[in-house]
UniProtKB/Swiss-Prot annotation:
The keyword Ribonucleoprotein is annotated on this UniProt entry: no
Residues the record lists as ADP-ribosylglycine modifications: 76
Organism field: Gorilla gorilla gorilla (Western lowland gorilla)
Name of the featured protein: Polyubiquitin-C
Propeptide position ranges: 609
Crosslinked residue numbers (Glycyl lysine isopeptide (Gly-Lys) (interchain with K-? in acceptor proteins)): 76
Gene: UBC
Xref: InterPro entries: Ubiquitin-like_dom, Ubiquitin-like_domsf, Ubiquitin_CS, Ubiquitin_dom, Ubiquitin_ubiquitin-like
Keywords, sorted A to Z: ADP-ribosylation, Cytoplasm, Isopeptide bond, Membrane, Mitochondrion, Mitochondrion outer membrane, Nucleus, Phosphoprotein, Repeat, Ubl conjugation
PANTHER family, alphabetized: UBIQUITIN
Single GO biological process annotation from the record: modification-dependent protein catabolic process
Gene Ontology CC terms, in alphabetical order: cytoplasm; mitochondrial outer membrane; nucleus
Domain Ubiquitin-like residue range list: 1-76, 77-152, 153-228, 229-304, 305-380, 381-456, 457-532, 533-608
C-alpha cells in the first residue's frame, strides 16, 4: 500500500509499504529517498511518536495515511517551566521531545499528573503530540504551567450582528483557546478575532481566570480588519507593552494608544525603531514597521540642550540634543552635519567609549558637555598589556583576534607560556575562545596580565538544576571572588548566591583555603530566593516551634536555628518531613518544604545509630 510522510518543510514523500513493515523499515525507506539517517528521524502519527520495533499495523496505519517526520536535533538543552505560584522548574530536554515527554518530566519533578497540566509558550497552549522544536522552543526558553481545573463552564460570545454563541470552556483556557473554539463553531480565523470583556481587549496568552471571566459571562466579538497587527513597545525599564495597530496608523495614533495603556502624555514620548526616532505625522508602513516589530519608548525629558563634539583635528561641532537621545541618534546627527558614517564614529566622554543603545542621560552628559570624536580606523590597532611588575608591553592586534592569539603574541615577546597567563580587562578574566571585539577591547585599551600561580586550580560548582560549572580559582580567592566569577559565567548576582561546602554555608570574607577547599572540590550553589518564610517544627512532647527560614536554607542551618531557640545540639536532632529523614547538606527547597510546612523533631538518643 502507499502511505505519505510529511516533513516540517511541508514536503510530502510517498512510500510503498506493507502493513507488516516495522517503523525501522519505514525509516530506512525514508533514508533511501531523502538521505536522512534513521537515528535523526522521529515519526509521528495521530499525535504519537512511533517506536522502531512496532509495525504499521500495530498503529492502525492504513493506506494513504499521513505520517509526520520530525528531525531529532543533536544535543540536549535546559528549559524553564514557571508555575502560577511563581516557582520555576528547570528541565533537561531535547528539541525533539514531545510535549507529552515534557509533562512526564514535570510529573517526575513535581508530582502533577500530565492530564492536569497545560503548558503555554508564546501565548499558545502546547499540544501533546508536537515537539519542542515544532514550537521553536529553544534553550533557556520559559514555558508557563497552568493547572487544568476540574469542571468546565459555559460562556457566551456576542457578535456585532447580535448573534450569541455558547462555548464550553475551563477557567484555565487561554484567550487563544477560546478563539480556536470560535473558529471551530463559526469558521472565523483567530487572527481576525478581537474579544472584549468589561471594556478590555483580551490578550491571547492570558487565561479566562486572569480576566475573572466566570460561568455565563458574555464576551463581545469584534472582527479585526485585514491589515491589523500587533507590535511591541519596550520601555527603558524593560517593560514590554503590546499594541493593536494598523500599518496605516500614524506615530501620533500609536502614542495615543500608549497613553491609553500607560498614561504617558504623547508629548513626553519618543519612539525609536531601527535606531531612528519616529516622526508624528508619518505612518508605521512609512518606516516598514511590520507585525511583531519592537519599538523602543524613550521619555522626553523636558527641554533640549546643546552639546559639543570635538574631533581629533581640533574642530568643534555644536549639536542640539535631548538627554534622552541615544548615542546612535547623536552619531546620526554628526553624520547629517559632517558626513561621517556612524560605524566609523567612536564617541568618548569622561574617558569612556559610549555605547550606541545608551542615552546621554545614562552617561550623565549635560548641557554644554564636550564629547570627543575618534574615527574608527579599518583594520589593526595597538593595545597594551600591563604585568604585575608594572612593565607595559605593546601589541599589534586586530579586533577579531582571539584571546588565545593575544596570549601567543605575549609568549613571542615575553616567553611566558599561554597556560600560565591570565588576562584581565574591565575586571573580567578573558576566555581563550572569545575575541577582543567580543569584550569591546579597542585600540589603546590596557589589559592586565596575571600569572597563573602553580597554586591555581579548578573547582566545580553544582547548581540545584544539576548543571555543573567549572571555575579557575586560587586557594587565596575569597568566597566573594568566587561569587563574582559565577556571576561572570552565569549572570546570577552575588547577593542571590549561597555557596555550600561540606554542608556549611560559606561566608563572603573567608578564603577557599580557610575552608580547606582543594582542587576539584565541588561546591553547591543555592539561589537565595527573595523573601523568607515561616515553617513549624513539632517535638514529640507536642510543643511547636516557629522558625524564619529561606527555601535555600540547608537542613544544617535549620538545626542551628533550632539550637538557638531550644538549646538542642544539632547532632542530637533528627528532622522528619513527609515521612522522610532530612539530610544535613540538602535544602528546604530540595524537599519541597514550603511556607507553613511542619517538620517533626525526633531526638537522637546517645549511643543510638
Amino acid at each position: 500500500m502507499q502511505i505519505f510522510v510529511k516533513t516540517l518543510t511541508g514536503k510530502t514523500i510517498t512510500l510503498e509499504v506493507e502493513p507488516s513493515d516495522t517503523i525501522e523499515n519505514v525509516k530506512a525507506k525514508i533514508q533511501d529517498k531523502e538521505g536522512i539517517p534513521p537515528d535523526q528521524q522521529r515519526l509521528i502519527f495521530a499525535g504519537k511518536q512511533l517506536e522502531d520495533g512496532r509495525t504499521l499495523s500495530d498503529y492502525n496505519i492504513q493506506k494513504e495515511s499521513t505520517l509526520h517526520l520530525v528531525l531529532r536535533l543533536r544535543g540536549g538543552m535546559q528549559i524553564f517551566v514557571k508555575t502560577l505560584t511563581g516557582k520555576t522548574i528547570t528541565l533537561e530536554v531535547e528539541p525533539s521531545d514531545t510535549i507529552e515527554n515534557v509533562k512526564a518530566k514535570i510529573q517526575d519533578k513535581e508530582g502533577i499528573p500530565p492530564d492536569q497540566q497545560r503548558l503555554i509558550f508564546a501565548g499558545k497552549q502546547l499540544e501533546d503530540g508536537r515537539t519542542l522544536s515544532d514550537y521553536n522552543i529553544q534553550k533557556e526558553s520559559t514555558l508557563h504551567l497552568v493547572l487544568r481545573l476540574r469542571g468546565g463552564m459555559q460562556i457566551f460570545v456576542k457578535t456585532l450582528t447580535g448573534k450569541t454563541i455558547t462555548l464550553e470552556v475551563e477557567p484555565s483556557d487561554t484567550i487563544e483557546n477560546v478563539k480556536a473554539k470560535i473558529q471551530d463553531k463559526e469558521g472565523i480565523p483567530p487572527d481576525q478575532q478581537r474579544l472584549i470583556f468589561a471594556g478590555k481587549q483580551l490578550e491571547d496568552g492570558r487565561t479566562l481566570s486572569d480576566y475573572n471571566i466566570q460561568k455565563e459571562s458574555t464576551l463581545h466579538l469584534v472582527l479585526r480588519l485585514r491589515g491589523g497587527m500587533q507590535i511591541f513597545v519596550k520601555t527603558l525599564t524593560g517593560k514590554t507593552i503590546t499594541l493593536e495597530v494598523e500599518p496605516s496608523d500614524t506615530i501620533e495614533n500609536v502614542k495615543a494608544k500608549i497613553q491609553d495603556k500607560e498614561g504617558i502624555p504623547p508629548d513626553q514620548q519618543r519612539l525609536i525603531f531601527a535606531g531612528k526616532q519616529l516622526e508624528d505625522g508619518r505612518t508605521l508602513s512609512d518606516y516598514n514597521i511590520q507585525k511583531e516589530s519592537t519599538l523602543h519608548l524613550v521619555l522626553r525629558l523636558r527641554g533640549g540642550m546643546q552639546i559639543f563634539v570635538k574631533t581629533l583635528t581640533g574642530k568643534t561641532i555644536t549639536l542640539e540634543v535631548e538627554p534622552s537621545d541615544t548615542i546612535e541618534n547623536v552619531k546620526a546627527k554628526i553624520q547629517d552635519k559632517e558626513g561621517i558614517p556612524p560605524d566609523q564614529q567612536r564617541l568618548i566622554f569622561a574617558g569612556k567609549q559610549l555605547e550606541d543603545g545608551r542615552t546621554l542621560s545614562d552617561y550623565n552628559i549635560q548641557k554644554e558637555s564636550t564629547l570627543h570624536l575618534v574615527l574608527r580606523l579599518r583594520g589593526g590597532m595597538q593595545i597594551f598589556v600591563k604585568t604585575l611588575t608594572g612593565k607595559t608591553i605593546t601589541l599589534e592586534v586586530e579586533p577579531s583576534d582571539t584571546i588565545e592569539n593575544v596570549k601567543a603574541k605575549i609568549q613571542d615577546k615575553e616567553g611566558i607560556p599561554p597556560d600560565q597567563q591570565r588576562l584581565i580587562f574591565a575586571g573580567k578574566q578573558l576566555e581563550d575562545g572569545r575575541t577582543l571585539s567580543d569584550y569591546n577591547i579597542q585600540k589603546e585599551s590596557t589589559l592586565h596580565l596575571v600569572l597563573r600561580l602553580r597554586g591555581g586550580m579548578q573547582i566545580f560548582v553544582k547548581t540545584l538544576t544539576g548543571k555543573t560549572i567549572t571555575l579557575e580559582v586560587e586557594p587565596s580567592d575569597t568566597i566573594e571572588n568566587v561569587k563574582a566569577k559565577i556571576q561572570d559565567k552565569e549572570g546570577i548576582p552575588p547577593d542571590q548566591q549561597r555557596l555550600i561546602f561540606a554542608g556549611k554555608q560559606l561566608e563572603d570574607g573567608r578564603t577557599l583555603s580557610d575552608y580547606n577547599i582543594q582542587k576539584e572540590s565541588t561546591l553547591h550553589l543555592v539561589l537565595r530566593l527573595r523573601g523568607g518564610m515561616q515553617i513549624f517544627v513539632k517535638t514529640l512532647t507536642g510543643k511547636t516551634i516557629t522558625l524564619e527560614v529561606e527555601p535555600s536554607d540547608t537542613i544544617e542551618n535549620v538545626k542551628a536555628k533550632i539550637q538557638d531557640k531550644e538549646g538542642i545540639p544539632p547532632d542530637q536532632q533528627r528532622l522528619i518531613f513527609a515521612g522522610k529523614q532530612l539530610e544535613d547538606g540538602r535544602t528546604l527547597s530540595d524537599y519541597n518544604i514550603q511556607k507553613e510546612s511542619t517538620l517533626h523533631l525526633v531526638l537522637r538518643l546517645r549511643g543510638g545509630v
